[in-house]
């Protein structure tokens, strides 16, 4: 019941050891599932696995952790640079399952050619704004106002989010 933290730090320049992170997460989650099952299906203390650079790790059997972990008080927080990383490692279906099991998504900054910005823009939906124009003739000033729908944030607006700012999607 004592709280603790484990940090696994692997050198970025040597990817030959990346498989160890996946093995550790897989084995740790199996052990935590077993402990939860011995204690009525829930861990006494919530366990959270923060997986920075999750998208660069070799794929491992992570889907059960997403789908079965929450009810046992075990959460995996994947931190990725691009949704394309998930699709590359877990395929289209696996990527969708992982995304569907993430209750909250935090986005900050995008590469100029990022398809993730397109996906997020669509996911955020649209809003209705008042748009208008004024034109002036010699004796005929006219004004036109109309309600129109636009994305809440366009892909270009998402790509220009200032450093240190984030979009949180529930």
Can you describe what each PLM-predicted range is?
Residues 55, 82-84:
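Acidic, glycine-rich active-site loops and adjacent beta-strand->loop/helix elements
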Residues 1-74, 89, 151-170:
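P-loop NTPase motor domains
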